[in-house]
Structure formats: C-alpha cells, structure tokens
C-alpha cells in the first residue's frame, strides 16, 4: 500500500515555508496530498479555487504530490484518502500548543491516524500567511516570503479589499 501523507492548511496565501515543507515531505513519503481547507466560518482573502491555483503554480515540478480541497472534519478526509498520517509544520514554540491540542484531538477521534510535525528551514521559521498579508497591506516588498506571482495576486486582492 502506498504511503500517503496529508498536508492540510488554508494556504492563504502559499508561502516559501509551505513550499519547503511540501518538497521535504515528498522526499519522505510516496505521495503527499496538499489538502486546502474550505472552512465556512473562516474568512480567507483568496477563494478556495484561487488558493488551489496558486499552490499548483507554486509546486510545479515537485513530484509525487497532488492538490485537493476538502470541507469538514480532517480525520474523515484522511480516512477517505486511505492515509494514516498527516503532516503539520511547526515554525515556533508558539505553534506547538495549538498543534499539540489538534493532534491529540485528532488522535482521540481516530487513534489510527498519526500526526507528524516538521520544522521548516530556519529561514522560514517566522513566516505565516497572516504576517505576510499584514506586511503586504503596508506596501512592503515580499520577495523573501512568497513567489513573485503570489505577491502580485496578494497586492491586487488587498487593493480590491481596501476599496
């Protein structure tokens, strides 16, 4: 049976940290499913379709991975995909408490599903989509945070939002 891992997230927008984690996960697992979360209660700057499209462009050339979206309970999605592992990024100690709580909740919901935490490269430890959106809204250059096309989409979306 193929070793599949699920990497869930909102990816609003996709960052160099996300791309780094995807690339490294494909070196460990036979197939990585990047699962874009559609969360009706969570407000995102980009639509689900836009987030998927940005991920497709950003991950071109990375083998053994696919991009899908899902809505609902993560453990149910993982089961449907016949996976037993999900991977989560831990940037800083501040991420740990939330991710630990989620991992334990998921384990309680399905003890067969494991959560693996991966650290990003040191140069990406501070990156978060939320921080990048904030910095972008103040007009900063984002070349160290996101790909050029993501920066352009981000600035366009923020300009539309501010009008």
Question: Which residues make up each language-model segment?
Answer:
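Nucleotidyltransferase catalytic core that binds NTPs
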Residues: 1-163
């Amino acid at each position: 049976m193929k070793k599949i891992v699920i990497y869930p997230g909102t990816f609003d927008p996709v960052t160099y940290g996300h791309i780094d984690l995807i690339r490294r996960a494909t070196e460990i697992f036979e197939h990585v499913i990047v699962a874009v979360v559609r969360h009706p209660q969570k407000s995102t700057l980009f639509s689900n379709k836009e987030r998927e499209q940005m991920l497709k462009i950003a991950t071109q050339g990375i083998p053994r991975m696919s991009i899908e979206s899902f809505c609902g309970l993560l453990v149910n999605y993982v089961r449907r995909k016949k996976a037993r592992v999900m991977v989560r990024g831990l940037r800083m100690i501040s991420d740990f408490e939330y991710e630990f709580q989620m991992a334990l909740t998921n384990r309680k919901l399905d003890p067969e599903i494991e959560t693996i935490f991966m650290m990003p490269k040191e140069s990406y430890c501070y990156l978060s989509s939320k921080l990048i959106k904030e910095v972008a809204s103040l007009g900063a250059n984002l070349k160290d945070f996101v790909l050029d096309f993501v920066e352009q989409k981000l600035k366009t979306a923020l300009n539309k939002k501010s009008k």
